[in-house]
């Protein structure tokens, strides 16, 4: 036994009567494994000299009455000193003012079991038979009151293999040092002040709330620790359960309780128990890894220390050792996982406040402990920030223990004022999430999963907030931001956020709208550039066309110059040469000699049959001359190649265009009025049909 823990109450009993779902069950040498019924009971005042624990127990061989405890403050209701619980122990509103450990145990006589349950430094410790004792701890002191919630599992083997468990909660009003305030179960606090000095002088007696995150008016929620035990399993056989954290819905067979809003909710789940610790805590320090090994509440059996590591890069808390342990059915941590949805409202009178509760199923004895500090506000309805400053993360986190204790936590959502702190397990930027809730996630793997690296703090869709406009007052919590801040990268503390409303949804959407505008401007600029490129291409095409036109014009000009030079030299020009100057000239020249221009028919589009019919209709139309007229008017001579002049002329004369034969020596040639020469017989036949030059289309022979 740890000498710091002091004596423990030991009782014995071989017979118990347990009540499960209204039926009495006779059990010999077995621990209490029943569904606890909530009752309103205050804490007894058993003051003893300083430094010694006080024991108050109630033993009975009949069905036992189990109570629910809640610490609170109120000045309008009678204190617990005027109340007597159902088992006859009168409670007092006075709390010890020294370091005395008060243990209230409910059990059977004649049994020897390990004491565990709920213990407050200088406060109350629930005995071995108290299970399913959710405590609603409310602080009323204006001074900061660091809290350290330790959830541990104790698996002791005694007469009936009684398995007990519980929750250890420490309140230290004398200081805020994390290293000195985190104590093992049963260790005495070393603070000079009273552990309960900051608490109110009275306790409210109210029904158990359906959700641990429901807070009463005038109270400051800081820690909600709930352990539940189910009696749906009939046997006490142990089974191996992997320590996993997953999500499930509450069992339908669970009894219902009514919260202070009048809303009925399920309190228990089927198959095992669950442990929940809820609080709205924040962190003012960014650490890469939080690893901690706890201490077993009753160190009767040595166990292996297993350290969990929470990193900003991962999504789960992974142990360094094995977590496979055999867990009895009556262990309060054996239960299907359950997560309850949460809704946020700004007011405490009209809205329903729920929170996301993470239940830890099938957790073994090797459960680690996260310690945090809490600061209570003086008689205020709003929760104050719970910080984990850098200077408080001392060697206490690095010192391995022989046992592991770990609370499961869910945040309180009754946020009526902006919270100034951030909760960060890992280093990062505080602006990674805005207007969000702490939603721990779970998975079916063997490792205990922690919140995802970059969670979105969004209320569940099935429970929308009653006043969404006030949700912006929530602090921008950031669990695992992916963006590292310069101070966090150097190991320094993360600066606190300023007070005031946080960024609204409109401001959050501003970067996306600016991005869209930048994209639109980029598209607009790209369109303008494309238009300019098209214009440049068009200009290039026009330039090429102009260059081609210029080349054509230059060619035409050169041809005209050649024709002019030929005319100046007196050379014979053809009709094509005149067409160079103007195409209309050639058209006028052809029309000039067409006497029957008005009588012309469009023979180009006429078929062969139409042309034959036209010839028969018109008849033979002859414009030629007779042979006698031709012989008289046409000049005739013989072609000779012997004379130099004839040789030179012969070289320049083209062949006969009618018969396409070259002129030979001694051929009779005929010369027309225009000067063109042909064979005499060829041109005579041509002029007899048509009095036109076959080359220039001018009048061949002049008639009298």
Swiss-Prot record:
Matching Gene3D superfamilies: Zinc/RING finger domain, C3HC4 (zinc finger)
Enzyme Commission code: 2.3.2.27
GO biological process: flower development; proteasome-mediated ubiquitin-dependent protein catabolic process; protein ubiquitination; vegetative to reproductive phase transition of meristem
Keyword Metal-binding: yes
Family of the protein in this entry: Belongs to the RING-type zinc finger family.
Catalytic activity, as annotated: S-ubiquitinyl-[E2 ubiquitin-conjugating enzyme]-L-cysteine + [acceptor protein]-L-lysine = [E2 ubiquitin-conjugating enzyme]-L-cysteine + N(6)-ubiquitinyl-[acceptor protein]-L-lysine
Pathway(s): Protein modification; protein ubiquitination
Gene name for this UniProt entry: MBR1
Organism, scientific name: Arabidopsis thaliana (Mouse-ear cress)
A GO molecular function held by the record: ubiquitin protein ligase activity
Compositional bias segments (type: Pro residues): 452-467
The protein's name in its UniProt record: E3 ubiquitin-protein ligase MBR1
Compositionally skewed regions (Polar residues) per UniProt: 43-61, 281-290, 300-329, 340-354
InterPro entries registered for this protein in UniProt: MBR1/2-like, Znf_RING, Znf_RING/FYVE/PHD
Free-text note on domains in this protein's UniProt record: The RING-type zinc finger domain mediates binding to an E2 ubiquitin-conjugating enzyme.
Subunit structure: Interacts with MED25 and UBC11.
